A protein has these predicted regions:
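Metal-dependent phosphohydrolase cores
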Residues: 1-161
Length: 161
């Protein structure tokens, strides 16, 4: 069956497998301790962004690498610190956290070029270099969509257990 024809409910199966793998091999669960937008943890945000990215890709029948899309989306904010703390290294977080996330992800996982590009370019246009791959463009849109909802309308987003 073509990826675009798979039922949306299978997104949860694909995602849960990827999440378990990243939790086992790296520090993904540390993201539960940090709150980037509203009251949503980085972990919850990353799961929502991965789900939304895959939903968009399937809904619009885009020919993409689903595994890379999910992994890149789950790791896009893998910076592993609380950027709200009074610390000079956290200034200009929006500009610098993609490179920190990429460095941390490379320490814990073997990334392919699509995943690397997704992580380091997800803040476009705040960071001026655009994404190179379709998966990274999808992530940019899904991340901004989820962050906006989490910040302005937190009750509209579901809670990740």
């Amino acid at each position: 069956m073509n990826p675009e024809n798979r039922p949306i409910r299978s997104i949860f199966t694909v995602m849960s497998t990827a999440i378990r793998t990243l939790e086992k091999e790296g520090r993904l669960t540390m993201e539960k301790s940090y709150i980037p937008h509203g009251s949503t943890s980085v972990y919850e945000h990353s799961v929502k962004v991965a789900y939304t990215s895959l939903y968009f890709a399937r809904r619009f029948r885009l020919n993409i690498d689903e595994k890379s899309l999910i992994r890149g989306a789950l790791l896009h904010d893998y910076f592993l610190y609380d950027w709200h703390e009074k610390d000079k290294s956290h200034r200009l977080h929006g500009f610098y956290h993609p490179s920190t996330a990429l460095r941390n992800a490379k320490e814990d996982f073997d990334l392919n070029p699509i995943e690397e590009n997704m992580i380091v370019r997800h803040m476009f246009p705040l960071t001026p270099i655009p994404p190179r791959y379709k998966e990274a463009w999808i992530l940019c849109l899904a991340d901004k969509y989820c962050a906006t909802i989490e910040t302005l309308f937190p009750l509209l987003m579901w809670k990740v257990l």
